[in-house]
Amino acid sequence: MKCNKMNRVQLKEGSVSMTL
């Protein structure tokens, strides 16, 4: 479950980076 949360954060960060 903890890994899932980390993955979600990474995905969110990646999305922001892609948008930028």
UniProtKB/Swiss-Prot annotation:
InterPro entries: Tet-R_leader_TetL. The keyword Transmembrane does not apply. One of its GO terms (biological process) is response to antibiotic. It comes from the Bacteria. Keywords: Antibiotic resistance, Leader peptide. Residues 1-20 are annotated as: Disordered. NCBIfam families: Tet_leader_L. This is Tetracycline resistance leader peptide. The lineage of its organism: Bacteria, Bacillati, Bacillota, Bacilli, Bacillales.
